[in-house]
C-alpha cells in the first residue's frame, strides 16, 4: 500500500528535479538530407521536430530516445491528440515507424527525406519512442536490462512523466498509444499502468487523458496465434498437403501443441521456441527462395525470408548512421543503429500475455482498435480472429449478433467517384476490428493513406453511406467531412434557389403578356421598379454564390501563397526554420489587398451572414442524416457499432476449424485451449496414415474428424530450419 502511494510521488519529484528545457530538443531540419527541398502542400506540411533522450528510470541511468513531429498549423491546447508510436520485437526501433510507416518522411535511394502523404502528423503530434532499453538509440549507462513487461511499463511511466514535464502543452491532449506487432504486448501493459496512475491522483488535472489503444497486426495471445500458422497457410495456399515438407510441418506443429499443453512453471508464456520452428518450416521449403513472412504473396531469397524487407530498411540505416543526422537529432552515437537488436530480450517468466489484460481495460472504458493487413503471415488475420472468438468481455464472448458490418473504401477526393477498396470494419462493446485489403505486417508502409483512415474513423472524419444494401465508410486524404458536407448542402440549396428564380421569372412574364397595352404603358414605371428589384435579388444571390466560390478560391490561393512565401529560394526551403527554430518557422502570408472597398466588403459580409444563418438549420439536419460518429462516445460523440470480417467464410479444405465440431480431442489442453482452433486430419487422409501411424492411435469412424497422431517421414534432404528467434515481430 505504501509502495502504491509513494511511487507516483517519487516519479513526479524525479521529473521536477531534471527540469529539461524543450528548446534543447529542437531539431534543425536543415541538417537532414533532402529537408530543404520539402514544400508545404494542401495535404502535407513541413513538421516541427523535437528529438533526444529523456530518463526512463528515477536514477537517470536509463535513457529513452524519442523523435516527435508536430504539425506547424497545430495550435496550443487544441483537440488534436498526442500519438506515441511503438514498434515491436521486442528490440525493434520505432525509428522504422517514423521513416517507413506513419511519420511525415520517407527516404529515397539517396537516403534523403521526402514527404509521406499518409503521415499521421497531419492529424496530431506523433512521437516515436525507442524502448525497451537497448532498442534503437535508447541505452543504459550501467547496462541495466529489464526482463519483465511490468518493468518495461514502469520505465515507460517514468519517461512519460519526464516528457510531460518537458512538454507541458501536451499534458491536456488526448494520449493515443499506437503500435504494431509485439507492441500488442507493450500497449495493454502501458495502458494498465496509466490507469493505475490516474486512480492514485486526487487532482483531475494530474491525470493522463487516455481513451484508446491502436494495435496493428498485434501479437496478443501467443498460444492461439502460434496455432494459426498451419491452417492459415493451408487456407491461403502457402502450403499444400501434397508438398514433400508437409508431413514434417505437421510433426513440428504437434510438437508445438504439446509444448503449449505442458507445464510452463519457470518458463515464459509469451514465447514458445517449438512453435516458432513451425513458421520456419512453412516459409522455407527449399534453399533457393522462401516466403516473405511479413507479406506472404512475395518471395525472398533464402535465408532472409523477409528479414531485409522492406527495401527502405537499408536507406533508413544509412540515414540514421549519418553523423550530421545524429547530431541534429541529439542522438547518442556510441553504437550503430540497427532496426532490431537480437540482444534485447524479455524473459517474461512472471508476465501473462497481454490478452489477459484486455477485458478489464475494455470494461474500464478504454477503446481497443485492432487493425490487420490481410497479407501478413507472422501475425495473421486467422490468428486474431481466433483470439477474439474466445475473448470474454462485458459479459459476452467474442462478437455477438449485435455487431454491425461496414465496408470501407478510400478516395483521394470525396467529391470524386474514384475509390479504392480499403478493407472492412467490425465493432462492438468498445472493440474495433479492422482489416486492410492487401496490407502487409507493416500496414502503413504499403497503405499509408488508407491506414490514416483508422484515425479518421476514431475522430468521426469518415462519411457513412448506404449503397447496394450495405453500409460503407468512406475515408479521404484530407479527412474534411465537415467541409464536404457543407459544400454539398450549399450546392443543393443553390440549385433549389435557381429553380425558384426561374419559376418566378416565368410567372412574371406570363402576367405581363396578359395585360393591355395601355395598362403596360401606364404601369411602366412600377414594372421597371419591380424588374429592378428582381434583378437586385438575383444579383444578391449571385454575390452569395460568388462569395462562396471566392472563399474556396481564397483557400486554394492561401495554400499556394503559403508555399511560395514559405520557400522564396532553394536556400530557404524549410519555412524559415533556420531563422526561428523555436517558433517553428511560422508561415506568414501577405494580406489580401483585393476588396479594399469597405462598402462592398460590408455588403457582401451582410449577405453572407444572412445566408449562413438560414443555411445553418438545414445543414444541421443534413449532417445528422448523413454523418455518423464512429467508435467512441462521450465528449459529444455517440456510439456506432460497426463490423466487417476480412477473412469471411474461412475455408481450410479438409482441415476443419469449426468451434462446434465434437470430434476434436482436447485432452491435455490447458484451460480454454482447444484443438479445434488448429485443424484436424479428416477421413480422406486415412489411407496416408496406414502403415505410418499405428491404428490404435487413430480414430476411423465414418465421417469422423480426429486429432489423430501427426506423422512424419524422415527427410534428410529437407531444407535447413530457419531459427525464428531471428525473425522479429517488428
UniProtKB/Swiss-Prot annotation:
Record: glycosylation sites: 60, 497, 507
Comp. bias regions, Basic and acidic residues: 486-497, 515-526
Stored InterPro entries: AB_hydrolase_fold, Peptidase_S10, Ser_caboxypep_ser_AS
Region described as Disordered: spans on this chain: 475-590, 684-730
Organism lineage string: Eukaryota, Fungi, Dikarya, Ascomycota, Saccharomycotina
Membrane topology: Single-pass type I membrane protein
Cytoplasmic-side positions: 621-730
Biased composition (Acidic residues): 498-514, 527-557, 579-590, 717-730
Family: Belongs to the peptidase S10 family.
Designated name of the protein: Pheromone-processing carboxypeptidase KEX1
Catalytic activity: Preferential release of a C-terminal arginine or lysine residue
Subcellular location, principal: Golgi
Residues passing through the membrane, by range: 600-620
EC class (word): hydrolase
Function: Protease with a carboxypeptidase B-like function involved in the C-terminal processing of the lysine and arginine residues from protein precursors. Promotes cell fusion and is involved in the programmed cell death.
Cross-referenced PANTHER family: PHEROMONE-PROCESSING CARBOXYPEPTIDASE KEX1 (PTHR11802:SF190), SERINE PROTEASE FAMILY S10 SERINE CARBOXYPEPTIDASE (PTHR11802)
Endpoints of the signal sequence: 1-19
Keywords recorded for this protein, A-Z: Apoptosis, Carboxypeptidase, Glycoprotein, Golgi apparatus, Hydrolase, Membrane, Protease, Signal, Transmembrane, Transmembrane helix
Organism: Candida glabrata (strain ATCC 2001 / BCRC 20586 / JCM 3761 / NBRC 0622 / NRRL Y-65 / CBS 138) (Yeast)
Biased composition (Basic residues): 699-709
Keyword NAD: no
Enzyme Commission number: 3.4.16.6
Lumenal membrane side: 20-599
GO cellular component, one term: membrane
Pfam families: Peptidase_S10
Amino acid at each position: 500500500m505504501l509502495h502504491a502511494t509513494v511511487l507516483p510521488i517519487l516519479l513526479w519529484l524525479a521529473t521536477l528535479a531534471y527540469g529539461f528545457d524543450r528548446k534543447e530538443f529542437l531539431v534543425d531540419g536543415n541538417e537532414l538530407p533532402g529537408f530543404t527541398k520539402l514544400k508545404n502542400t494542401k495535404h502535407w506540411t513541413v513538421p516541427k521536430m523535437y528529438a533526444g533522450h529523456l530518463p526512463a528510470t528515477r536514477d537517470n541511468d536509463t535513457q529513452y530516445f524519442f523523435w516527435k513531429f508536430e504539425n506547424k498549423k497545430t495550435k496550443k491546447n487544441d483537440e488534436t491528440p498526442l500519438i506515441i508510436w511503438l514498434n515491436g520485437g521486442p528490440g525493434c526501433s520505432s525509428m522504422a515507424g517514423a521513416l517507413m510507416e506513419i511519420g511525415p518522411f520517407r527516404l529515397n535511394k539517396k537516403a534523403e527525406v521526402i514527404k509521406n502523404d499518409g503521415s499521421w502528423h497531419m492529424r496530431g503530434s506523433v512521437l516515436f519512442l525507442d524502448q525497451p532499453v537497448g532498442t534503437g538509440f535508447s541505452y543504459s549507462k550501467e547496462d541495466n536490462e529489464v526482463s519483465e513487461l511490468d518493468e518495461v511499463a514502469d520505465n515507460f511511466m517514468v519517461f512519460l512523466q519526464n516528457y510531460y514535464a518537458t512538454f507541458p502543452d501536451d499534458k491536456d491532449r488526448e494520449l493515443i498509444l499506437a503500435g504494431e506487432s509485439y507492441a500488442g504486448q507493450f500497449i495493454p501493459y502501458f495502458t494498465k499502468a496509466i490507469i493505475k496512475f490516474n486512480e492514485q491522483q486526487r487532482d483531475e488535472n494530474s491525470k493522463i487523458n487516455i481513451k484508446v489503444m491502436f494495435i496493428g497486426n498485434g501479437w496478443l495471445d501467443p498460444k492461439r496465434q502460434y496455432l494459426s500458422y498451419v491452417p492459415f497457410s493451408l487456407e491461403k495456399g502457402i502450403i499444400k498437403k501434397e508438398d514433400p515438407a508437409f508431413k514434417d510441418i505437421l510433426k513440428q506443429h504437434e510438437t508445438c501443441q504439446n509444448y503449449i499443453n505442458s507445464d510452463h512453471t519457470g518458463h515464459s508464456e509469451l514465447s514458445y521456441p517449438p512453435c516458432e520452428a513451425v513458421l520456419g518450416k512453412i516459409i522455407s521449403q527449399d534453399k533457393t527462395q522462401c516466403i516473405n513472412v511479413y507479406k506472404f504473396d512475395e518471395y525472398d531469397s533464402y535465408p532472409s525470408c523477409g528479414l531485409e524487407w522492406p527495401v527502405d530498411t537499408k536507406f533508413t540505416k544509412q540515414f540514421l548512421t549519418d553523423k550530421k543526422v545524429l547530431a541534429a537529432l541529439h542522438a547518442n552515437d556510441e553504437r550503430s543503429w540497427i532496426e532490431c537488436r537480437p540482444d534485447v530480450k524479455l524473459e517474461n517468466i512472471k508476465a501473462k500475455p497481454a490478452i489477459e489484460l484486455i477485458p478489464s481495460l475494455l470494461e474500464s472504458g478504454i477503446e481497443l482498435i485492432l487493425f490487420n493487413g490481410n497479407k501478413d503471415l507472422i501475425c495473421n488475420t486467422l490468428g486474431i480472429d481466433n483470439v477474439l472468438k474466445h475473448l470474454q468481455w462485458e459479459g459476452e464472448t467474442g462478437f455477438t449478433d449485435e455487431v454491425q458490418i461496414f465496408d470501407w473504401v478510400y478516395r483521394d477526393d470525396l467529391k470524386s467517384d474514384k475509390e479504392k477498396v480499403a478493407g472492412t470494419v467490425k465493432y462492438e462493446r468498445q472493440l474495433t476490428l479492422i482489416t486492410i485489403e492487401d496490407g502487409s505486417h507493416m500496414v502503413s508502409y504499403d497503405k499509408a493513406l488508407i491506414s490514416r483512415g483508422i484515425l479518421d474513423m476514431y475522430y468521426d472524419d469518415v462519411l457513412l453511406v448506404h449503397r447496394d444494401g450495405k453500409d460503407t465508410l468512406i475515408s479521404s486524404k484530407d479527412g474534411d467531412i465537415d467541409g464536404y458536407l457543407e459544400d454539398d448542402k450549399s450546392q443543393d440549396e443553390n440549385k433549389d434557389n435557381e429553380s425558384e428564380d426561374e419559376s418566378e421569372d416565368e410567372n412574371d412574364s406570363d402576367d405581363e403578356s396578359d395585360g393591355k397595352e395601355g395598362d403596360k404603358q401606364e404601369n411602366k414605371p412600377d414594372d421597371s421598379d419591380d424588374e429592378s428589384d428582381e434583378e437586385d435579388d438575383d444579383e444578391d444571390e449571385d454575390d452569395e454564390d460568388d462569395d462562396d466560390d471566392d472563399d474556396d478560391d481564397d483557400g486554394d490561393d492561401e495554400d499556394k501563397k503559403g508555399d511560395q512565401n514559405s520557400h522564396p529560394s532553394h536556400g530557404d526551403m524549410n519555412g524559415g526554420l533556420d531563422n526561428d527554430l523555436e517558433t517553428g518557422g511560422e508561415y506568414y502570408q501577405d494580406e489580401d489587398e483585393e476588396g479594399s472597398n469597405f462598402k462592398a466588403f460590408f455588403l457582401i459580409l451582410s449577405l453572407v451572414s444572412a445566408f449562413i444563418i438560414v443555411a445553418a438549420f438545414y445543414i444541421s439536419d443534413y449532417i445528422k442524416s448523413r454523418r455518423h460518429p464512429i467508435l467512441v462516445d462521450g465528449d459529444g460523440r455517440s456510439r456506432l457499432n460497426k463490423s466487417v470480417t476480412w477473412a469471411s467464410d474461412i475455408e481450410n479444405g479438409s482441415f476443419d476449424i469449426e468451434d462446434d465440431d465434437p470430434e476434436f480431442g482436447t485432452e491435455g489442453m490447458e484451460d480454454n485451449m482447444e484443438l479445434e482452433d488448429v485443424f484436424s486430419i479428416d477421413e480422406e487422409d486415412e489411407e496416408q496414415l496406414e502403415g505410418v501411424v499405428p491404428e490404435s492411435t487413430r480414430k476411423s469412424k465414418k465421417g469422423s474428424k480426429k486429432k489423430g497422431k501427426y506423422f512424419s517421414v524422415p527427410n534428410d534432404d529437407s531444407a535447413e530450419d530457419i531459427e525464428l528467434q531471428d525473425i522479429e515481430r517488428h
